[in-house]
Amino acid sequence: MVSLADFGPEVRAEVKQVREVVAALHQQLIKWNLVVWTAGNVSQRLHSADLMVIKPSGLRYEYLTPSSMVVCDLDGNVVDGAEAPSSDTASHAYIYRNMPDVYGVVHTHSTYATAWAATGQNIPCGLTMMGDEFGGPVPVGPFRLIGSEAIGKGVVETLKKYPK
């Protein structure tokens, strides 16, 4: 089993910095009412190694700290952390393996986005500023169950249909 100690000082320094960023981003999810209870998560891929940092499973947002963030390889195996990683770890890892230009994943459960996603329809481009920002409708991925690569596969399949 690989551990964080197997990596050099550059990687360990980046892990420390990314843990701080990912923990802080989770607090922003609460601040902006984008999640409830323990649902949703943020992860970030490292630039210096094929590793990612993600929140632990089941830990309430108010208890998240940089040291509670879990470091995993891009197959979802834990490299460092005291807790089990998020139940969405396999999906985040799938996205990073299949979209190498992606360095961050944010999975929220905001009320309006969740309600819209239940319709299975793309969000129409109804404003000029949406067209400027997104280039057209905002794609909505297919429904998938958590706990496997399924959500990640749905995200990759959906996003690969659209130009960058």
Model-derived regions, located:
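Glycine-rich flexible loops
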Residues: 1-164
